[in-house]
Amino acid sequence: MQKKVVQSASKNEELDPHYKRSSVPFPYGLPDYDAEYQFINHHMQQLLTRPVEGTHSASVHPSTSSTSHISSPSAFSVQNPNPNDAPFVGNIGLDASGFSSGGMSEYYPRSVSMQQSQDVHFQNTEIPYYHRSPSSDSFSPGVVASVNPNSNNSPTFYSNPPALSNIPIPLNNSPYRPEDAYFQLQGAGVKADINPYNLSPYSQYGPEGTAYSNAQAHHQDGAPLQRVCSAPDPPKTSMPPFGSAGSPSPNRSLNVSNNTTPPLSTVNKIIKKPKATTGKVKKRLPQAKRACAKCQKDNKKCDDARPCQRCIKAKTDCIDLPRKKRPTGVRRGPYKKLSDTSNNTKSTTASSGHSTQDSLSSKMLDPSSDNQFAMSSRQMDENGMAQYPSSAIKQELNLQPQILVSSASKNFQPNVTPPFAVHHDHFNSTSMDGVAVSNMDETGTSSAGSKPFNRKSRNRSFTNPVGMTEEHFLREYAQHSVANPSLLIHQIHGLPSEQVHGLLSHTELGNAMHNQPTYNESSIAAENVNNWMLETNDHENLSMQSHFEVPDLKMNHHDSSFFDRHIDQTAMPGQNQHGTVKNMETMHHFYPDVHNSEFPAAPNPVKSQVPYYYQSQAADDEEEDVPDHQPSWRGRIHSFSIATDSSQHVVERPCIHSLRGIHGQQDGGLEQHDGDHVNMLPDTHAEELAYTSMLLFHDIPTRDIRPDFNVHELVDHGTYPNFHQNQADSFKNHPFRQ
């Protein structure tokens, strides 16, 4: 029964050469073709060759196979459509489990296009195949038959088929490329209907690396071979095979058709290499310092040659325009030119004076020019004695005073706001740059003409109070000052809204705030600039009430991001309408000339010097009971302070805080009097903010502080050197730490 079915299938193929079996369904559901399907066919066609003698066919099954099946050409083998040619090897897939009781398995051998090729002897070539069982629509690998074409023995079957990666390589070990196979065919005179540069990665190759057509294979005599079974043709792709680096360029692609193509040597002649540039490359001429008229008009570079290359190409005249002579003498330079003819004499006189001074100053700086200057300025008498003219002596002697007076007259104007002046308007919205920064330039030199501090100040801004602190100490330690009170009225944060009223006597503070000194240009020298506050008029009849009046203490915004330096009266319990400045006996070592006897009658007597330390009338009555040299800490109203909530978090917040004064112990705790400042922050923040404020703003400066004081040194050492002498230098002994 089995033989009849097989023979009927073979008879159908013999009767109808165009008989095709049913197409194999795609196991993976690809729309065009199966990549694995084409990959296997590619290697199968590399293995199949025509044997020398004998007809061989694949065995049916170990249980049904015999030597008669192999010797008989009609026993389960695919017949060659061309009877004149020798038989060839066919590949038929069988069911590995044998025939089932329900009927025979459907065999779907892989598409193998047989092709006549050269006589190649090979042995033990493993041919993998796939089969499909009736109960499943998917393909599974079957057994592998080892065929020896030189023997009539039945092939050996292996139970474990090799994987696709173990498929045998082609007989020739040399790597093959599509273009090589194509040119081999063309050299042999074989026609081909494929483009070697248009092959897909799964294109078919004949034995020995020769390419063949998917649609029709040709023998050497031109007789076509029919395909054993139908298989989908792979689509044509224009991408080079595998995207290799050695793939041919698009310029090398050929339109291959059924017509005969010239051999490889002819193709190589057609491909012409680009010719090398002949001739010498002209060197660029050096660029001219002054271009010709045409190049100047076109705003182009010009070479030194005349005519230049651009003029030669444009066929124009190459002309150099005459240059304008540079003015000589006193009019040399644009800053000496004046359009008004009436000022020519003035400009000539001024320029001559400047040129004389410049030459003298330059010769004074250059020691090598002393002898020349001396020889040119003196005259030799008949006896060989040098005689200096009186004009030269007067000019040399008067040179330095003229420079000083001229510089002082330029920098100072009468009835102007003195440097570091205190703005009485507490609600002035002037920016910090116009108040504090404008008084000092980047080199540490006062804009009013004072001597430099020989130190560069850092950037001063709201977010860098350290720079403001250094600026504060630079002002205090100005040179050539008998009594420099700049610390007493300076603005701690550089803003006009914060004043320090506590360290000056009433008379000095009133004179400084209300009476601006009048400068006399003839008597002011550069080194006396810092002493402007000493030239004040005594006004003993000024009302002390007006000087120490506290303005309306209301919260407002100085700008969009910081609060003003004022608080509401409601935040100050027990505060009178007119606050007083509480002085401190312990500060007398810093200002020995300040004493309580200097203070005239005031609404509230003052005894200590602490900036912005407000005191109520009730506290003034108890002032007599307060011991002298008490450890009184400073108190201040700050709009913001920098503190650390944790080791990784640094905050800058608006706040109002102060250190509470220690007036005694009561029940083991701190006693707060009515006159003390109210701490507006929680106790957890008060310690950090108070200590940070002392580090940043130096609220109790002493003579031990240095002008180059660095706040970072304090942070490293963890101490603050400006504590009171009765207190320790460590923050651990702070009143809040007790």
UniProtKB/Swiss-Prot annotation:
Q: Which GO terms describe its molecular function?
A: DNA-binding transcription activator activity, RNA polymerase II-specific; DNA-binding transcription factor activity; RNA polymerase II cis-regulatory region sequence-specific DNA binding; RNA polymerase II intronic transcription regulatory region sequence-specific DNA binding; RNA polymerase II transcription regulatory region sequence-specific DNA binding; zinc ion binding
Q: Which GO CC annotations does the UniProt entry carry?
A: chromatin; cytosol; nucleus
Polar residues composition bias: which ranges? 1-10, 246-266, 353-372
Question: Compositional bias of type Low complexity: which residue ranges?
Answer: 55-77, 340-352
Q: Tell me where it mainly resides.
A: cytoplasm
Q: Which residue intervals are annotated with compositional bias (Basic residues) in the record?
A: 323-335
User: What UniProt keywords apply to this chain's record, in alphabetical order?
Assistant: Cytoplasm, DNA-binding, Metal-binding, Nucleus, Phosphoprotein, Transcription, Transcription regulation, Zinc
Name assigned to this protein: Uncharacterized transcriptional regulatory protein C27B12.11c
Which Gene Ontology BP terms does the record give?
Answer: cellular response to phosphate starvation; cellular response to starvation; intracellular phosphate ion homeostasis; positive regulation of transcription by RNA polymerase II
CDD domains reported for this sequence: GAL4
